From Swiss-Prot:
The gene is rocD1. HAMAP family: Ornith_aminotrans_3. It catalyses: a 2-oxocarboxylate + L-ornithine = L-glutamate 5-semialdehyde + an L-alpha-amino acid. It comes from Staphylococcus aureus (strain Mu50 / ATCC 700699). Pathway: Amino-acid biosynthesis; L-proline biosynthesis; L-glutamate 5-semialdehyde from L-ornithine: step 1/1. It comes from the Bacteria. This is Ornithine aminotransferase 1. Keywords: Amino-acid biosynthesis, Aminotransferase, Cytoplasm, Proline biosynthesis, Pyridoxal phosphate, Transferase. The lineage of its organism: Bacteria, Bacillati, Bacillota, Bacilli, Bacillales. Pfam families: Aminotran_3. SUPFAM superfamilies: PLP-dependent transferases. Disulfide bonds: none annotated. GO terms for molecular function: identical protein binding; ornithine aminotransferase activity; pyridoxal phosphate binding. The modification N6-(pyridoxal phosphate)lysine is found at K252.
Length: 394
């Protein structure tokens, strides 16, 4: 294991600081390191593996398509793209979908759509369009996505970033109201902040944002890359407040843990600003990606993983809330997306959990984030809870 870590560290760029663990196999909820030790994966590639690692249905779809046709580019039609587009548009109740690859790429596309809509439809002078984002957000690390962030450490050394972006506190509707100007074209938010620490907004906040957008002719963009597709116990986390955004951004679990697939969805009145040549993606919507994503969506539906997430997530949250320890500040979550916030450094607790076979990661130094595959069962949840009890007891 050490030789693998040394080799990787020697040749890899320095933008990651991985846990000193080498994983070589995954199946369902579990992963194994190179020494053969088994772990319950509570990271899931940050909600990529909602369907579990190497789900046989998705693997089968991948291998069958890979042996037939993998790439043709969007200059031609493929035989499976239209059916997938119909499926995902019906799921999101939107007219159109733009198929892409990574999550941050989809955010970039949504920014372009919002800017173009702002100038062409709302009538804002081109170059003066503004977008409001939330403090503590995470939309990605490419320049456009990064421009939405308020984290100076993420942005240091990468200026100049996009102009016309501002951030306000997540959950503060008064502050958001004050930030709106005639040039505001869009408000982008995560319905539940993931990287920020599983931050759930006050009840009614998402509805209030929707009302503001309707009042001021502003696009509401929901970044559901991490929290969508069953993670919080709903197909879309926006459903917790019965709100439909103007634009959905999806990714991560859309590729079933096997392939990078992302999407931007909107109705015709928004998506029509994209015309031939205004946007494109070499690999976006390729036949292999679409076969995998189709199977990934089918697995979520056929195995009722969204409902399972809500049911078992509630069970896990209730059990974790029984934990008593002076280090625990708050435990919060929706579905199988849970944050344990401590009033001290979380890293030592994470180390102890990993030693007990629970693979997890801290975020923002004091928060342990849990997002196991949605195929997890009650016995595995009992193991997670037992590990937490043991760690906090000792």
């Amino acid at each position: 294991m050490n030789s693998i870590i040394e080799l990787t560290d020697y040749y890899s760029s320095n933008n990651y600081a991985p846990l000193k663990l080498v994983i070589s196999k995954g199946k369902g909820v579990k992963v194994w390191d190179t020494d053969g030790k088994q772990y319950i994966d509570c990271i899931s590639g940050f909600s990529v593996a909602n369907q579990g690692h190497c789900h046989p249905t998705i693997v089968k779809a991948m291998t069958e398509q890979a042996s037939k046709l993998s790439i043709i580019s969007r200059v031609l039609y493929s035989d499976n793209l239209g059916k997938w587009e119909e499926k995902i548009c019906h799921l999101a109740k939107k007219d159109k979908v733009l198929s892409l690859n990574s999550g941050t790429e989809a955010v970039e596309a949504a920014i372009k759509i919002a800017r173009k809509w702002g100038s062409e439809v709302k009538g804002i002078t081109d170059g003066q369009v503004e977008i409001i984002a939330m403090n503590n957000n995470f939309h990605g690390r490419t320049l456009g996505s990064l421009s939405l962030s308020n984290h100076d450490a993420y942005k240091a050394g990468f200026h100049p970033l996009l102009q016309g972006t501002t951030t306000v506190d997540f959950g503060d509707i008064e502050q958001l109201t004050q930030a709106i100007s005639p040039n505001t074209a869009a408000i982008i938010l995560e319905p539940i902040q993931g990287e920020g620490g599983v931050n759930i907004p006050p009840k009614g906040y998402i509805q209030a944002v929707r009302q503001l957008c309707d009042k001021h002719q502003i696009l509401m963009i929901a970044d559901e890359i991490q929290v969508g597709l069953g993670r919080t116990g709903k197909w879309f986390a926006m459903e917790w407040e019965q709100v439909v955004p103007d634009i959905y951004i999806l990714g991560k679990a859309l590729g079933g843990g096997l392939y990078p697939v992302s999407a931007v969805l909107a109705n015709n009145d928004v998506m029509r600003v994209l015309t031939p040549g205004t946007h494109g993606s070499t690999f976006g919507g390729n036949p292999l990606a679409i076969a995998i994503s189709t199977a990934a969506l089918d697995v979520l539906k056929d195995e009722q993983l969204v409902e399972r997430s809500e049911r078992l997530g509630s069970f896990l949250l209730k059990a974790l809330l029984q934990l008593k320890h002076p280090s625990i500040k708050e435990i919060r979550g929706r579905g199988l997306f849970i944050g344990i916030e401590l009033n001290t450094d979380a890293a030592p607790f994470v180390d102890q959990l990993i030693q007990r076979g629970i693979l997890c990661k801290d975020t923002h130094r004091t928060i342990i984030r849990l997002s196991p595959p949605l195929v997890i069962d009650k016995e595995e949840i009992h193991q997670i809870v037992a590990a937490f009890q043991d760690v906090f007891k000792n």
